[in-house]
Amino acid sequence: MFNSNCRNKIFCILIFFSLAFFTENAVCEQPKKRDYWPTGDWKASAPEQQGMDSAKLLIADEFIQNRLPDAFSLLVVRNGYLVFEKYYSWGSPEKIAVVHSVTKSVTSALIGIALDKGYLDSVDQKLIDFFPEYASGDLDPRIKEINLKHILTMSAGFRWNDRGPVMRDWYTSEDWAKFTIQLPLVTMPGDKFNYNSSISHLLSIILAKSTKTSTLDFAKQNLFEPLGIQSGFWRQDPQGYQIGGFGLGFSARDLAKFGFLYLNNGYWNGQSIVPEQWVKQSTEQQIQAVRHPFYGTFGYGYQWWVKQVDGCSSFRAWGRRGQYIVVVPELDLVIAVTSNPGLPHPPTSIHYSPLFDLVAASVKRKRPPKSPLTAVELPADVKAFILDYDQARFNKDVVKMAELISDQFIYNGVTKQMAVEFLSRNLPYMSEAKIIITKYEQEGNEVKIDVWLKDKYFEAPFMTGSKLIKENDHWKWFGNQVPNSP
């Protein structure tokens, strides 16, 4: 096992090897039978004994130190054994981390357990049936059509922004459930994904009402204690309900246990903890979620994110400020990450994705050769524009970047102002990566391009399918004019 003293281990002197990233055709494996269960604690194993490459794991370690300064821990479990465990900054095995929205995935598991035990009937049950006190005559009739599945898939349709003033108003209100249910509806239930922590909280209230116990007590009896999870805390709302969308405290090892439960389809030491069918439904895409210019499309299940990792199907619990459980069933792999929960939201948050590809790439398996990125030839004026833009990006020159981006810019819902703010942050992975144009099509004053970023750790599409447009004889970045999911 790697730990904080791993540099004293013999296998730590192995030489770094190059990695292949974003390989869609990588050969994946199936989970194996377990010869022990980590109810008490994890058993350690050298990476090579579990079919992993120590040197490549060390590249993941280097990536954290060079790219993710807020990280507290990285744990890697392969074949049920802890093959890598390292703590950074203030992290430690005993530290209970605020895991933010990883809480949502735990709440989802509890909903599945409650359904299995008969406390709930089905995901088709209407939200308002659990809150009849708010079913007044002037309530939008569409709200009465919202069911549990809409809540689980973030498609209830309420007007909401998790980082906007509505979140603050909800958080400071006296009755969180009432505030949420009386929000205006902007889309029909089930039509569109919109990330919303307030509706995840409703799931916790529904659990407490249905089971006639607190969400925490229900979790301890039916989930935490069978797995040997020692939860540190679970914050409450003003009415005393555990917060369904955030506020849970877990150690990194306990995060890995929860991921291991889902890796094993809800079974633990021969006992079904979370129904297998619920695990399957929760971790497969129920709705398209986020389209990100750097990492492509994320799907969403029942409070779980769905995204490939190094070419293999995968799902993840994702908490703000760098809290993750990533499960890759085809590689028999669980990755747990905790980070400083108290810092301002780091611009590196979504940049944890290459870390998971790095870890998965350390699993020894047959892999087809990776085709190198090939840059296309560009006309002199377009090439000059790209070079100017690249230099402004590297220098974080906000004024210059604003000059080079059209006022009409929109890329998957990202406006010019948002793009400039994002690009001007202290993002080493953005400023140090090389831009490679792999596709170029010009028609009049418009140019369609595919752009990739490449550095020593990764290569990834960036603003792919974007356009340049000539305005007053000057090329400017135009985006793609396609609205995105929130």
Show which residues each predicted segment covers.
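Surface-exposed, charged secondary-structure patches
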Residues: 420-465
